Design a protein with these regions (language model features):
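Aromatic-lined substrate-binding rim segments of carbohydrate-active enzymes
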Residues: 603-662, 707-730
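Short, acidic, metal-binding catalytic loop of nucleotide-sugar glycosyltransferases
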Residues: 76-87
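Membrane-embedded multi-pass helical conduit in multi-pass membrane proteins
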Residues: 2-28, 40-43, 50-53, 305-395, ...
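Extracellular glycoside hydrolase catalytic/binding regions
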Residues: 704-800
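Active-site-adjacent substrate/metal-binding segments within catalytic domains
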Residues: 210, 551-638, 660, 668-669
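Active-site groove signature of glycoside hydrolases
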Residues: 668-706, 730-736
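The conserved acidic donor/metal-binding loop of glycosyltransferases
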Residues: 141-145, 239
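Long helical/loop segments within the catalytic core of UDP-sugar-dependent glycosyltransferases
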Residues: 112-136, 148-230, 240-241, 258, ...
């Protein structure tokens, strides 16, 4: 992580300043969250259940508010009464419901209500505390159904007089009710597993508000349950500030309901974010000096979870602004960026999977993708909670809806729809204005954000989609197939997760080692590549100076043409082609993955403008490539001609390069797609392959390779002419002493070639050789020295 942060904070990678610092804020925040998570994996502690040495009197409280389902509260009360440890049960009924009075009377439950309804849930519990006498007080949410042995692993921990409360796992029974329920549950798995277990070591175990057992004297010491929207965390803070200790028992002793609709989930998250921010602003400073140093960090960091709403917003804005303004937040080699990001990302995933040995149940293991996506879709709720805190706006304490019904949630989707629409508009505008690789990458990020928004919207409409699928057999069949696919994937996923947990440490060590290796030996690789290039240039010089056998005599015979024993100009001599053309080989953007800053359309248009000022009227562009759109659009706008070239690698298997997916097929598809561009003046087959083959082959093998190339080239030129008979087709040859003979051979074998492009990269070949070429020719590439000594003043068109 230090290597990652050091790399991205380097001054050399800074791009457009506002976007860069926005991105750095997002990166730093994410790294801090990861560090916080890792710190809660260091001391995973499962406390042993002490032997029971005495009996405690226990009061169990649950609540009811008007509108909550009767079936739910009756089920909970019945289960509470079935708990085997002796206790008294209290229903804190805010509605003073007559039906529930009868139920309580029948079950032997104390029915408690109040007339002064203050402090929401905390006030309701405190009212019941005032009329109860138990030494221990259990708070259960009305949707959480306890098991008969609920109290057995908890009670004995209170033999330690310093323990103020004991918290157990919040587990759920409706995880599979829908994507919202599944995602909301997944967000809790790591927290109630290894993270809360580590809080045992730090002395920072939180009271969660449900399934928590308090010592009455501890509550009395702080005046009862603390009030607020996050009353559970407030109570924890007050008790810890008083010096009370807490214990987390990682045991599933009750199961409740997780929000299953978007409105219920958003209400819960808004209540928590507003409540936690309020505690951070108004309570945390007052209690700060009374916390241990671990508790100071703990309660100071928890609100940062809800600050992630701003980070998500930044992540939405960066690609949008980048696409609209045509700027980049960072100037970094994509390979280098991958080398610094991927190892850290892999370590985060592997560590998270490794600690899943300590989650509660097997179904809680996994990537928790649904939970992560749902969290991203909650960005605006977190921001709203923060804004409400600053504005002092109060929101009513409303119990999380439990019925799973939702009529119309489109208004709740408006912020996500805005992000979706804005991102789509930015993608269309940005790529239309400047189709370069970096804009495509940014469009990819914006597209990912669109997917995040679409997921949350689709998840919120899942009930409506189910109704729709039942009305249409096709959708019903697709839904059935998807369910079967998920079942099969679940089996595969279990095996993958198990393997990752087992081998996580070894994989992580391997990744770190590979990162060090690539970083250490990259300079050696560059040196080896440089030496290889020098050897290649040496071989080229040998071929040009006739010190190496180019294989031409054998090739003449293989092609069925007579061998010229002496070189002479036959016919009228060189015929100038593209006369009046002053061109440039424009190769910017070819190695775009290792080029930064990004090659933008603005830079391209400025280059073309300067070219026109110096008299250049044509560029030679190699394609097809990512910059075709920009280059062809800009050259058309500025009335610049294009000599469209195709680079032919010499290592191509020309004997087998036929059919779909072949190089020739790609070239022909490009010609068909672009032949309507009027400012493309010709098609060029680039790279003097027939001569370069002599560097790596010799003898009969060389002859076979060269003959295969000629046959391939003949088929290709024929195909191009069939698609576009009006434009000339040219082919490159290296300018050497043998060039006139080679051109004669190629022109005889492939008469459809309209002209030959001379690649002139040295000054040793006499200029007279250029004049002796008995075919139409032009200069497709020339170095500066060769231009001054051999080409300047010649008749044919020139590309430098």
């Amino acid at each position: 992580m230090g290597f990652f942060l050091g790399s991205i904070f380097s001054a050399s990678v800074r791009g457009y300043a506002p976007l860069y610092w926005m991105l750095m804020a997002a990166f730093v925040f994410s790294c801090l969250k990861v560090v916080h998570e890792w710190c809660h994996y260091l001391f995973i502690t499962v406390p042993k259940t002490p032997p029971l040495t005495r009996r405690y009197t226990v009061d169990i409280f649950t609540t009811f508010c008007a509108g909550e389902p009767y079936e739910m509260i009756v089920e909970t009360l019945t289960a509470i009464q079935a708990i085997t440890y002796p206790h008294e049960t209290y229903l804190c009924d805010e509605a003073d419901d007559p039906y529930l009075r009868q139920v309580c009377s029948k079950l032997g439950v104390h029915h408690v209500t109040r007339t002064e309804k203050i402090n929401a849930k905390a006030g309701n519990i405190n009212n019941a505390l005032s009329i109860s006498k138990g030494e221990l007080c259990v708070v259960l949410d009305p949707d959480h159904v306890p098991f008969p042995d609920f109290l057995d692993p908890i009670i004995s921990h209170f033999d330690n007089p310093e323990i103020g409360y004991v918290q157990i796992v919040q587990a759920y029974k409706n995880n599979d009710e829908g994507l919202i329920a599944k995602g909301a549950a997944q967000q809790t798995y790591q927290f109630y597993g290894p993270m809360m277990m580590t809080m045992n070591k730090y002395g920072t175990v939180l009271a969660i508000g449900a399934n928590c057992t308090f010592r009455r004297t501890a509550l009395d010491s702080i005046g009862g349950h603390a009030a607020g929207l996050a009353e559970d965390m407030h109570t924890s803070m007050q008790l810890h500030a008083k010096g009370w200790k807490s214990v987390y028992v990682p045991a599933v002793l009750a199961r409740g309901l997780v929000p299953s609709t978007l409105s219920a989930y958003y209400k819960q998250q808004l209540k928590w974010s507003r409540g936690v921010f309020d505690l951070f602003v108004h309570v945390y400073p007052k209690l700060f000096s009374r916390f241990t140093w671990q508790q100071k960090l703990h309660y100071g960091v928890i609100p940062l979870h809800y600050m992630s709403g701003f980070i998500f917003l930044i992540n939405f804005l960066i690609p949008v602004i980048s696409l609209v303004l045509g700027v980049s937040p960072m100037h970094i080699d994509l390979t280098d960026f991958g080398l610094i990001v991927l190892p850290m990302a892999a370590c985060i995933i592997l560590i998270r999977h490794f600690v899943q040995w300590w989650v509660m149940e097997d179904e809680e293991r996994g990537f928790h993708v649904v939970g992560g996506l749902l969290l991203i879709g909650t960005w605006w709720i977190f921001i709203l909670g923060f804004v409400y805190t600053l504005a002092g706006k109060k929101i009513p304490y409303v119990p999380t809806p439990k019925d799973g019904n939702e009529a119309n949630n489109w208004p709740l989707n408006v912020p996500n729809l805005v992000v979706l629409g804005t991102s789509l508009a930015a993608i269309i505008y940005g790529l239309y204005q400047d189709l370069n690789p970096y804009n495509i990458i940014m469009a990819g990020f914006a597209g990912i954000n669109c997917f995040f928004m679409c997921f949350t919207i689709a998840a919120s409409r899942q009930q409506q989609l189910h109704v729709l699928s039942h009305k249409h057999p096709v959708l019903q069949s697709f839904s059935k197939w998807l369910k079967e696919l998920k079942g099969n994937f679940w089996i595969l996923r279990r095996r993958i997760y198990s393997g990752m947990r087992t081998a996580a440490f070894l994989i992580m060590v391997l990744l770190i080692s590979l990162t060090i290796y690539f970083g250490k030996f990259s300079s050696r690789t560059e040196k080896e590549e440089r030496l290889a290039r020098e050897n290649e240039l040496h071989m080229q010089r040998l071929v040009r100076n006739n010190s190496a056998d180019s294989g031409l005599p054998a090739l003449f015979r293989a092609a069925g043409h007579p061998v010229h024993t002496k070189r002479s100009a036959t016919g009228p001599g060189s015929i100038a082609f593209f006369a009046g053309t002053r061109g440039v080989n424009y190769t910017k953007g070819h190695n775009w993955a290792r080029r930064y800053p990004a090659f933008t359309r603005q830079e391209l248009e400025e280059d073309l403008r300067q070219m026109k000022q110096t008299g250049i009227n044509t560029i030679r562009h190699f394609g097809p490539g990512i910059y075709d759109y920009n280059i062809l659009k800009a050259t058309s706008t500025q009335s610049m001609n294009v000599h469209y070239a195709f680079w032919v690698p010499e290592d191509t298997d020309f004997a087998d390069d036929q059919g779909f997916g072949s190089l020739s097929d790609e070239i022909l598809e490009t010609v068909a797609a672009l032949k309507g561009k009027k400012h493309i003046v010709s098609w060029s087959i680039g790279n003097p392959v027939i001569q370069k083959l002599a560097k790596t082959h010799s003898g009969n093998e060389l002859t076979i390779k060269q003959k295969a190339y000629l046959d391939w080239l003949a088929r290709l030129v024929k195909g191009i002419k069939a698609l576009d008979p009006t434009r000339p087709v040219t082919a490159d040859v290296q300018f050497t002493l043998e060039t006139p003979d080679l051109v004669n051979l190629m022109h005889t074998h492939i008469p459809a070639i309209d002209a030959f492009g001379m690649v002139i990269s040295d000054t040793k070949t006499p200029k007279a050789i250029l004049d002796s070429i008995n075919a139409r020719s032009f200069i497709s590439y020339v170095t500066e020295d060769a231009w001054l000594q051999q080409v300047q003043g010649s008749g044919p068109g020139v590309f430098i």
